[in-house]
Design a protein with these regions (language model features):
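A residue-level marker of the well-folded mature domains of exported/periplasmic proteins
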Residues: 1-227
Length: 227
């Protein structure tokens, strides 16, 4: 994880700083429990990437109310109880993708979107920006907005479940590269050709990210270094 690596590099320079990690693996309950344990331990600072907007908010509010500085990274909650937010403008990401697709289709065509985890702030904001961009092009039809979970398998399953609608679409946009690649595999298995696939992130991760982006028509790069 790039963030973890950079945090480690910085803390190596400060012998009196202890850095603790916890991975919730996209599990709301586990993330809540982990944050509770850090609160009980009396940590001096929390850096959190909330799995989903609503379910993690109460425990983050609790930490903030106890006077613990909270930095939200990449994802937000539905509360203003945090010290700082570090992340990209995901509404702008969605708008950029929407404009690219509109220009690629010359203002006319059919599109399918695969969202990330429904209640995660990047999925919400990217969809918002995407819809805003497409609203300027009345001849572009957003046929379906499918639910994924940021994984290649969820992209595959979501398209499989909507294969009838997918048959005559022109472009599939996955809100990240892995979902776009999963969709591409599902369409290929169904014998559907001549569809363009657009992804997002191009992060340097094993088995995805940049390697997925190379197999797509386009990908918007989601910056992750030195925010």
């Amino acid at each position: 994880n790039k963030l973890n690596d950079e945090l480690l590099m910085e803390t190596y320079q400060h012998k009196d700083v202890e850095l603790l990690f916890a991975s919730a693996k996209d599990n709301d309950k586990l993330q809540t429990e982990q944050i509770e344990k850090f609160i009980q331990r009396g940590v001096d600072l929390l850096i959190i990437s909330p799995n989903q907007v609503h379910s993690i908010t109460p425990v983050i509010d609790k930490a903030y109310d106890k006077g613990i500085p909270v930095i939200l990274f990449d994802r937000k909650t539905d509360s203003q109880k945090y010290t700082a937010f570090i992340g990209a403008d995901n509404v702008k990401v969605g708008k950029t993708i929407g404009e690219f697709i509109a220009k690629t289709l010359h203002g006319e065509g059919k599109v399918i979107e695969i969202k990330g985890l429904d209640n995660s702030s990047p999925a919400i904001d990217r969809h918002k920006g995407f819809v805003q961009a497409l609203s300027r092009y009345p001849d572009i039809q957003l046929k379906r907005t499918l639910s994924g979970e940021w994984t290649k398998e969820s992209g595959y399953k979501s398209i499989k479940s909507a294969i009838v609608d997918a048959k005559d679409c022109n472009i599939v946009w996955g809100q990240n590269d892995r979902m776009a690649e999963g969709a591409q595999r599902a369409m290929a298995e169904a014998g559907i050709r001549n569809v363009l696939y657009v992804g997002t992130d191009a992060l340097p991760s094993k088995g995805g990210g940049r390697s997925c982006a190379q197999r797509q028509a386009a990908c918007i790069v989601y910056l992750s270094h030195s925010w």
